[in-house]
Each structure stands twice: as C-alpha cells, then as structure tokens.
C-alpha cells in the first residue's frame, strides 16, 4: 500500500492560454516561464498522473483581433492555430530539457514537426507515460481553444479539465476591478450559468456540462498551484454537477 496523500486525479487535461507563456515580459515567450512550467508539470508527472495539455496562441495571434485589423476572420483563426503549434514546440523543448517524455499531436498535421491528432494515439501515449500536447485547437476556425480543451478532455476520458488562469479561481466579479469580489470554491454548472460567471468559453462550458466533465479553475502563476490542484480539493474553484 502506498503511504502518504494520493493525487485526486489519474488523468488530467490542462488548458493553458498562450499569454501564460509571456510572463511579465514583452516577448511572446519567456524562457523563464517555460522552465517554471516544466518544473510544475514534472512535479505532477512524478506522482504518476497522466497529463495532456491544450495550449492557446493568444501571445502571437487572436483571430478576432486580426479581424479587427482587416484580416479575414477564417484566415486569422488559422494563423492562431499555427501560433498554438509554435507554443507547443516551445513547451516540448522545455519539457525535454527536464527529461519529460512528450509528444505533440496537432489537429493540423505538419510532417516533420508534429504528428496528426488521433484519439487512440493520444490515449496510447498517455498510457505509456508520455505528456501529450495538443496543438492547433480543433483544426476548425471559429472554435476557441477552450472548446478544444473540453473536446480533447472528453475524448481522452480525462478525470478533469484544469483551466489555468491568472486569478485564483472563479469570482463573483472581476477581482482586478472589484476588490470585494467573492472567490467561489465550488459551483454547479447551473449556478455558474445562472450567475453568468466567466468560467470559460460558453460553448466549451456547456460541452463540459453535457458530458459531465468537471472543471477546476486555478492560478497558474501561483507557485506550486498545479501540484496543489492535483492534491488538494481546496485549490482553485471546482465546477461540476453539484449535489
């Protein structure tokens, strides 16, 4: 029998924004942030937890912003998908330097750069002890990487989708604007919808609700938060079917 606390989850889908890789710098990717991410993921990996990651591309491009600048929205979304692949390559490099076995599976195949996404292949890699990074969203325009996270989480039978943000969880209001905003520790899907709380993209959120996929929202910038959310029910905000 294994002594000591055990992880709450066996297989997780971690959703990270592209902006998380910027840190506080002016560059799209901060190498120090990559090193910290690799350290955090290694801590969880060493517990025997299977880890899959969906990474955004907002540190390079956002389709909506490019549309406002005059670029066709569909074209802008494809540019954003390629940005997620650049981020995936950066993460893979950092993980490999930390001796983590890792594979990139892309919804847009790119021979010599990343393998094409295949559900069975993804599950096989996880079962073989490899970290899997999903790139290029769902491969479809007009679909957010939040939706890619909910979809991939359901496809790989993850125990939970971990939504990494820059705040400690889901609040009653924007904590940056309202210091009196309340941090929720536990919400049902219906409560979050009724209160119009910004948990994630609405389509992605409803998909998680419909397929009973729990969500944990937490602060990726908080030291040790990823490990804590795996081990501790109190870290971040849990959103599920409720009682």
Curated annotation (Swiss-Prot):
Its main location: cytoplasm. It catalyses: UMP + ATP = UDP + ADP. UMP binds at residues 57, 77, 138-145. Its EC number is 2.7.4.22. Keywords: ATP-binding, Cytoplasm, Kinase, Nucleotide-binding, Pyrimidine biosynthesis, Transferase. GO terms for biological process: 'de novo' CTP biosynthetic process; UDP biosynthetic process. GO terms for molecular function: ATP binding; UMP kinase activity. GO terms for cellular component: cytosol. Pathway: Pyrimidine metabolism; CTP biosynthesis via de novo pathway; UDP from UMP (UMPK route): step 1/1. Catalyzes the reversible phosphorylation of UMP to UDP. HAMAP family: PyrH_B. Belongs to the UMP kinase family. Homohexamer. This is Uridylate kinase. The lineage of its organism: Bacteria, Pseudomonadati, Pseudomonadota, Gammaproteobacteria, Legionellales.
């Amino acid at each position: 029998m294994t002594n000591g606390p055990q992880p709450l989850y066996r297989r997780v889908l971690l959703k990270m924004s592209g902006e998380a890789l910027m840190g506080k710098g002016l560059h799209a990717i901060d190498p120090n942030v990559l090193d910290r991410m690799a350290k955090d993921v290694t801590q969880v990996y060493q517990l025997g937890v299977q880890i899959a990651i969906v990474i955004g591309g907002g540190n390079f491009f956002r389709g909506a912003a490019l549309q406002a600048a005059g670029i066709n929205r569909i074209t802008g979304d494809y540019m954003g998908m390629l940005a997620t692949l650049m981020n995936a390559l950066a993460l893979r490099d950092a993980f490999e330097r930390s001796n983590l076995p890792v594979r990139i599976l892309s919804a847009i195949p790119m021979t010599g750069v990343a393998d094409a996404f295949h559900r069975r292949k993804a599950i096989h890699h996880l079962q073989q002890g490899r970290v899997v990074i999903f790139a290029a969203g769902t491969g479809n325009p007009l679909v957010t990487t939040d939706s890619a996270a909910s979809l991939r989480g359901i496809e790989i039978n993850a125990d939970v989708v971990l939504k990494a943000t820059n705040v400690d969880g889901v609040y009653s209001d924007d904590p940056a604007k309202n210091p009196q905003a309340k941090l929720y520790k536990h919400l049902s899907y219906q409560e979050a919808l009724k209160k119009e709380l910004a948990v994630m993209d609405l389509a992605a959120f409803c998909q998680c609700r419909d397929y009973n996929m729990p969500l944990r929202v937490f602060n990726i910038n908080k030291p040790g938060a990823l490990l804590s959310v795996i081990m501790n029910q109190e870290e971040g905000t849990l959103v599920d079917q409720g009682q």
